[in-house]
Amino acid sequence: ESRGLGDVYKRQGDGRVNRGVQEVLKYTNIKKITPEDFLDKKFDYPVFCNLDTKDYVIHNENKKFELEHFINYPREYQSKTFEYLKESDIYISAHYWDPSSPKIFTKNQITNFTKLKIIGDVTCDVDGSVPSTIKSTTIEHPNFCINKDTFKETSEIENALAVMAVDNLPSELPRDSSREFGNGIVNEVIPFILGIDDGRILNATITEDGRFLDKYSYLKDYIDSK
C-alpha cells in the first residue's frame, strides 16, 4: 500500500520551484490528491499532495487563518504538518521560508515519522525549516543519511533518513532556467534599476556597503560559521 509516495509542500503562493516539483511528479504518473484525501483515504498506488500555507500552519490560539496576518506575524503560528509526515514515504520541500516562521517539524518529532525514508529539501536552508538539512550537498554528491535518533550523518541504513539538499538545484535545468531567468531580468528587474524602484530592488538586495541589510541579517551567522 502506498498512501503517500510524494508529499510536496510550498510556502506562500504558487512558486516556480514548487510548480517545477509538481511538473516532475506529473511526468512520473504519481497522482495528485487533496490534503484531506491524503490523510483520510488509503490508496493502492503512489500519490502526493501539495500543501498551501493554510494547510500546514495554524495560529497558536487557533484563530481563523489569514495569509496576510501570517506573513506579518509568523511567530504567532506553528506547524501542523505532523499528521502528513506520519503518512509520508517521501517529503519534498519546495517553499520559501522566513526564519521567523515555524519549522516544518522538530528534531523531537522525527522519530514518529516511521514511514518517512527520503527528504528532498529543494529549499535547502541549513538548520532552517527542515531540521534534517544539517548541511548542503552538491550535484556530484547530492545526498547523505542521518540517524533519526542522533541527527548525525551516518553510513548505516537502519533508522536512517536519506536527505537530498543541493543548494543550487533549481539551476540544474540550464535551458529552462536561463530562459526564465533572462526574461525575468529583462522585464522585471532592469526597468526598475534604470527607473523608479517600486520596492522590488530594495527587497531583493542582500548586502549594501559590505553589510547585510536587516532583512537578511540572519545569514551572517551562517557566513561566520564557514
Where are these regions (language model features)?
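Adenosine-phosphate binding glycine-rich loop
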Residues: 3, 118, 123-226
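Flexible, glycine/charged-enriched surface loops at secondary-structure junctions
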Residues: 6-7, 31-43, 194-205
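Glycine-rich Rossmann-fold phosphate-binding loop(s) that bind the pyrophosphate
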Residues: 13-14
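N-terminal Rossmann-fold NAD(P) dinucleotide-binding loop
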Residues: 18
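Rossmann-like adenosine-cofactor binding region
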Residues: 43, 47-153
